[in-house]
């Protein structure tokens, strides 16, 4: 591997390790939280509504229990990182969306990969 290319990859890894994005750090503390972040942000950018149940179904079954997955979502919602909305057409459906601050910080996080 060329030295310049290697140094570029090392710089990316350094910035990923040393960023100060508080909300992203919260989701990086646990694999389940990180997967939830990626699913919620993908849905947000695709302008899709993801129910809590669909998010749980999207998570690998072997990384955590359903209770842990729900606890992760509840914790993120309580902190205001994720917003829980009830469907207007079906009150049983609950959607999870990122907060504006999370969208901004996630955008900064993605720039670390692209710059």
Model regions and ranges:
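Short, cationic-aromatic polyanion-contact patches
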Residues: 87-110
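Short amphipathic alpha-helical interaction segments
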Residues: 63-78
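A short, conserved structural fragment
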Residues: 77-87
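Short alpha-helical segments that sit at the start of domains
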Residues: 10-40
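Amphipathic alpha-helical dimerization/coiled-coil segments
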Residues: 12, 20, 107-115
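Regular secondary-structure segments
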Residues: 41-45
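Short acidic, hydrophobic short linear motifs in intrinsically disordered regions
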Residues: 46-59
